[in-house]
């Protein structure tokens, strides 16, 4: 298997971001973003997706976390698209249900080349610590637009907002892992009857 690794740098007047990842890693996460709760969530992506993920961000968090969170999602999406390459041999689709105590979430992903986000998380709180829960939409929208995936995210139940979003990110990591696994029966084959994605 050829290395499925990528490094992407994205610099704007609002953020300076670097992402390095290995899709066939050991689930190691290294983060320095100035947004601690997002780092906790990205660690779930790395561990449950078995992706080595290194993210640094110097953003305008003195204003708020919006630009950093959205731009990190964009840059991770770009890096995954780069690492996946032509998509030949991958399973393409992934899904996962993950519980955490009273919370349960489902994530379904398709590496279709068609960006689309359907997300329903009825948060029980507007903030988790200092983190604005509305920003998770910005993270996933940025990711979807630049990874070129269709993503359905549903929190099916939960009373604790931290549990709600943690189950989402764990399920997201596991769905990514499933979709990006190489299928030995599909070696060199595009997972689409169209012949392209």
UniProtKB/Swiss-Prot annotation:
Its main location: cytoplasm. InterPro entries: IGPD_sf, ImidazoleglycerolP_deHydtase, ImidazoleglycerP_deHydtase_CS, Ribosomal_Su5_D2-typ_SF. It is an enzyme of class 4 (lyase). Pathway: Amino-acid biosynthesis; L-histidine biosynthesis; L-histidine from 5-phospho-alpha-D-ribose 1-diphosphate: step 6/9. One of its GO terms (cellular component) is cytoplasm. It is found in: Cytoplasm. It catalyses: D-erythro-1-(imidazol-4-yl)glycerol 3-phosphate = 3-(imidazol-4-yl)-2-oxopropyl phosphate + H2O. Keywords: Amino-acid biosynthesis, Cytoplasm, Histidine biosynthesis, Lyase. Gene3D superfamilies: Imidazole glycerol phosphate dehydratase, domain 1. It comes from the Bacteria. GO terms for molecular function: imidazoleglycerol-phosphate dehydratase activity. HAMAP family: HisB (MF_00076). This is Imidazoleglycerol-phosphate dehydratase. The lineage of its organism: Bacteria, Pseudomonadati, Pseudomonadota, Gammaproteobacteria, Cellvibrionales.
